[in-house]
Amino acid sequence: MSIFNGIKEEQMDILREVGNIGAGHSASAMAQLLNRKIDMEVPFAKLLSFDELVDFFGGADVPVASIFLRMEGDLTGSMFFIMPFFQAEQFIRELIGNPDFDIEDLGEDHMSSSALHELGNILAGSYLTALADLTKLQLYPSVPEVSLDMFGAVISEGLMELSQVGEHAIVVDTSIFDQSHQQELKAHMFMLPDYDSFEKLFVALGASL
């Protein structure tokens, strides 16, 4: 029997609430970073298959900015924070104070790359802290890696590992709202627990697997 048969909507609701708790911590950290009021929320958390994941993002050929890191500790897995080019470009322009920044220059501009690294540290650290508090598991993120590529290429490595548990990923939608500039930034977090960690995570959340 698939381990996913025992996962109920309640467990996904818990992951969404964990996301909202983490979003509160992230908003405070980003407000300090940008020196203005930031609101964040997590509209939903879903468990999606590979095909659904690609459709959800609009196709494998969509160019994206990706922040990749590993979840380590009692659970292991891959985490991706993925944004369309224009959203990442908008965030970096705000953070480095350069309205002319072009996302294509990311690899040549240390300051802009550092901005996305910091975003990854904030989002992953806040989410994993909230998840660890709820499950009583020890969790922490690795150092983030930033890349620009097509969506399908970005997640292919993580999905190859995930194929052992049925090609499903946890999607946590994140909405970041800049009150001062009335701007919204959408970031999608894809969490791909390793084979041994997927069941452990949902058991910790109360699923009967």
Swiss-Prot record:
Gene Ontology MF term list: hydrolase activity
User: Which keywords label this protein?
Assistant: Chemotaxis, Hydrolase
EC code: 3.-.-.-
Describe what happens without this gene: Cells fail to synthesize flagellin protein and grow as long filaments. They do not respond to attractants. CheC mutants showed overmethylation of the MCPs compared with wild-type strain.
Listed Pfam families: CheC
What is the uppermost EC class here? hydrolase
Q: What is the effect of changing D149K?
A: Impaired chemotaxis. No binding to CheD. Almost no enhancement of CheC activity by CheD
- An annotated GO BP: positive chemotaxis
Gene3D superfamilies linked: CheC-like
- Annotated TM spans: none
What InterPro entries does the annotation carry? CheC (IPR007597), CheC-like_sf (IPR028976), CheZ_family_phosphatases (IPR050992)
Coiled-coil positions are: none
Q: How does it assemble?
A: Forms a complex with CheD.
Q: Tell me, what does this protein do in biology?
A: Involved in restoring normal CheY-P levels following the addition of attractant by increasing the rate of CheY-P hydrolysis. Is only 6% as active as FliY, which indicates that CheC may function after addition of an attractant to cope with increased levels of CheY-P whereas FliY may function constitutively to remove CheY-P around the flagellar switch to maintain an optimal level of CheY-P. In addition, it was shown to prevent methylation of the methyl-accepting chemotaxis proteins (MCPs). Inhibits CheD.
Q: Which family does it belong to?
A: Belongs to the CheC family.
Q: What is this protein called?
A: CheY-P phosphatase CheC
- The gene designation is cheC
